């Protein structure tokens, strides 16, 4: 979303004005914006690539992750879910770690929702979450 808004408003206007707001008349980018349609498409590409790998003979495909971690931002969790749903076993634990966030800044897009909202966001997903470092 930030590259889109940088392009739409210009970097200086983004930093001076728009980054402090939750959105405009068209888009919401804070706090903790959802994954954009482009992000969903990219995550689906990751999923499809892994699915292709796993259809190869076992000795050719890479091993599945043994530890799954994510930042606490909803867009990160959505990327993880789209990428790995149906590949990792149902109920796989996702370790949510605060320090995995790309930025802990003052811009609204860098702020995250509450633990309750994160749990609600993940409620219908096939993964269990374990939140660390709050």
Q: Where are the regions a protein language model picked out?
A:
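Short alpha-helix plus adjacent loop in nuclease-associated cores
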Residues: 101-111
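Active-site-proximal alpha-helix that buttresses catalytic centers in soluble enzyme cores
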Residues: 1-92, 96, 105, 116-124
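Short linear capping/connector segments at secondary-structure termini
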Residues: 97-102, 132-134
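Acidic, glycine-rich loop-and-strand cores that form catalytic or ligand-binding grooves
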Residues: 111-134
């Amino acid at each position: 979303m930030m590259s889109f808004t940088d392009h739409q408003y210009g970097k200086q206007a983004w930093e001076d004005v728009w980054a402090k707001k939750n959105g405009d008349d068209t888009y919401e980018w804070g706090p903790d914006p959802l994954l954009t349609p482009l992000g969903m498409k990219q995550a689906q590409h990751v999923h499809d690539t892994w699915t292709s790998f796993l259809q190869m003979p076992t000795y050719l495909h890479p091993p599945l992750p043994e530890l799954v971690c994510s930042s606490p931002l909803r867009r990160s969790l959505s990327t993880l879910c789209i990428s790995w749903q149906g590949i990792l076993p149902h109920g796989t634990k996702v370790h949510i770690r605060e320090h995995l966030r790309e930025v802990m800044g003052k811009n609204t897009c860098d702020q995250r929702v509450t633990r309750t909202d994160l749990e609600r966001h993940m409620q219908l997903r096939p993964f269990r979450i374990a939140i660390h470092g709050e």
